[in-house]
Amino acid sequence: MNPNSKHNTNFTNLLKPSDSDIKQFAAQHIRHLTDLLNRYAYEYYTLDAPSVPDAEYDKLFRELEALELNHPELKLPDSPTQRVGGEPLAGFAEVRHEVPMLSLTNAFSPQDENGVFDHAEMYAFDQRVRDGLDGGKPEYVIEPKFDGLAISLLYRDGVLVQAATRGDGTTGEDVTQNIKTVSNIPLRLHGENTPELIEVRGEVLMLKADFVALNKRQAENGQKPFANPRNAAAGSLRQLDSRITAQRKLHFFPYSVARQQDGFVAEEHIQELAYFQALGFSLPNGNFGCFKNIDEVLAFYEHMQQKRPELPYEIDGMVVKVNSLAQQHELGFISRAPRWAVAHKFPAEEALTIVEAIDVQIGRTGAVTPVARLQPVFVGGVTVTNATLHNQDEVSRKDVRVGDTVVVRRAGDVIPEVVRVIFERRPMRETAVAVSDGIGHRQDDLFAETPSANQTQSVPLHKPYRLPTHCPICRSEIEREEGEAVARCSGGMLCQAQRAQGLIHFASRKAMDIDGLGEKQIEQLVAQDLVRHFADLYRLDIPTLQKMKETADKTVAESDQMPSEGSSVGASGKHKKQPVKWAENILAGIEASKTPELARFLFALGIRHVGERTAKTLAQAFGTLERVRRAPEPVLACLPDIGTVVARSIAHFFAQAEQQAMIDELLAAGVAPQTQAVTIPPARHAEPQRWIARLPGFKISENKAQALWELAGKNIEGLQTDKALPTDWQAWRSEPQNAALLENLKTFFAQMPSEDEAAQGSDGINKAVAGKTFVLTGTLPTLKRDQAQSLIEAAGGKVSGSVSKKTDYVVAGEAAGSKLEKANALGVSVLSEAELLTLLG
């Protein structure tokens, strides 16, 4: 046969694989290598029983990399090559948690001088659990409380599709690209019984050995070392360039299932942990367990406290959970924490150091806090140079002085504090003293016939510490009210320290939420006297902001002998101004903050004792800023979660002319707090006998107050004028300030809507929404979750986290999930975002 014949050529072509055949083979081999490498990783990280040497794994890994390089379109979502990182991101996207990531209540077991634990708080926890279960006997699971970052991992059809940080518990950041670089997180779940959807909660951390190695590299590269493994893990996980994250070895340990569809259904938490391991996750084997009673739990806790230094990772306690998931459900939640779990913290770590100086810090409310400046000491995983001394009483009680050797503790492993002084190490000096000669004469007696020999005694080198009498910042007097532990600077907003801290709080995210205006800018504005009051922020313009930045940059340039930031030097040596987009962004943020929710505005004012929760209570009780400004102290004291002390603080704030003027200035500058629906009508809580019993300076029980109210004809005018009332009442009301208070109460109640009026929708309450319970689920087209919640609450509705028979509406967005299914099963009305907005009007 002629080898060059046409038939022979066709036969050769038939033997040559087509492009589609090559691609099919590549796809099959990529799938094979991906599965094989993931299995080897599972054996290595989860089972701790590798079946192949590292060199074999590396060879297969490089083979997979080469295939993916030639066929990037065939790269699988669970490919282990993703663990080396990808291209940098522009920023982290927000992620709304379908199930909030809640915190745990803390419990402490202090040790005495002999190392004996006091477990009273844990026994109290056990009793609360038993009471909640009507005497039932719970089993407990105890597991390490890792000192890392809480992370939520979402798997769909077994593949990791999203990873999010905890954030504020409701909203976190999307860190999926970085999480994929964590070696012991499965990119595809193992096993045959993988769920259709599962959200796994756990902790990302850095092992101690990896932390030491990282800091060594940082030092070798001339970079700042990390303070502790937690900071290193946090900094690594929040890198926009995931290739940097990949270089820093992070670990993950799971601790709970947030939600799940299909797959194995656990009845106990210990079964959940076993399920995690079956799915390919690592567990802290040997460091957790299930126990029959609280005494066994506490014995294991003490064992782990002793074992803590030997662990490969940092832990700051143990988490104790009721094992039965049914019992967990029965116990439920309180506020933002489960009743069925507690974080049992270890005793804080302590170390010795020397007090080099004591000075004071001035807080935004004027609180004067003495602070010990310390010789640097490594304690609780960080280098400590400052420690709080709390107040003058604490300084005096502990007798802390400059030069003292002290025990420093990181209280709760967060805030360093001075625990006690080692008095035998106190620096002393010798001083001459006058002593008796034994006959009754003294050494300093000029008429003594036989003077005694000179004698000396040791006295402390430094005098006892006393707070300064005047503020070191503004020189205003430091005052301390009777019965108060904390002394305060009397300068108010005249004090630069209070002014800066007050403005930082005012602009903060949970207050007015002024986007773009950070602490550094505010500190510069205050230091340069460009802003003195809240309203001054709303008068800022681009020239003022430019002046602030130029002055700040000039200071930096003079100290560094470098051209200032924000300018450039051309060939001629002349400075060219940069664009002012940054200033425009700040002004846009200020403008956007002009219509805050009433609760945010009240919180922003910085009223003493008024946190977010109290501010929300005030908004829900009074509805408008004007009503809050005029609310009498006895009415405030009747509201939920407020009480006498907080009520007095609120009333005192609004009684000051300068505070009212400050609010008027804000209103004049265009700030307009939104009207809030009255969902906690004062009439419901401030019944006559209750507010009468809370009148300042008049002691009376609620029963007697009720009798007084009836004697007065059940009206305030009778209380003001009836001459047949008891003489002690008549004496009280004759005082001018008390007469004014009664008049204020009469006017206030006359102008407040009744409970019925509030329920019927007066004062802006939406009749269709007031009193209704809403549940939000899924991603809405235009509204963020907190925006939708604010709109509902402003109209008088309530937002719940779970669907029940008491739910009136479920507002469903994209990927609504199990809440939508439950709503349909219970026959609860389901609304789209558009339908919600229509309902809200």
From Swiss-Prot:
The organism's place on the tree of life at top rank: Bacteria
Active site, UniProt feature: 145 (n6-amp-lysine intermediate)
A Gene Ontology BP annotation from the UniProt entry: DNA repair
Function, as annotated: DNA ligase that catalyzes the formation of phosphodiester linkages between 5'-phosphoryl and 3'-hydroxyl groups in double-stranded DNA using NAD as a coenzyme and as the energy source for the reaction. It is essential for DNA replication and repair of damaged DNA.
This protein's encoding gene: ligA
Cofactor(s), names only, from the UniProt record: Mg(2+); Mn(2+)
GO molecular function: DNA ligase (NAD+) activity; metal ion binding
PROSITE patterns hit by this protein: BRCT (PS50172), DNA_LIGASE_N1 (PS01055), DNA_LIGASE_N2 (PS01056)
Record field: catalytic activity: NAD(+) + (deoxyribonucleotide)n-3'-hydroxyl + 5'-phospho-(deoxyribonucleotide)m = (deoxyribonucleotide)n+m + AMP + beta-nicotinamide D-nucleotide
Stretches the record annotates as Disordered: 554-575
UniProt-listed Enzyme Commission number(s): 6.5.1.2
Pfam families in UniProt: BRCT (PF00533), DNA_ligase_aden (PF01653), DNA_ligase_OB (PF03120), DNA_ligase_ZBD (PF03119), HHH_2 (PF12826)
GO CC annotation: cytosol
Binding locations of Zn(2+): 471, 474, 489, 495
Protein name (database record): DNA ligase
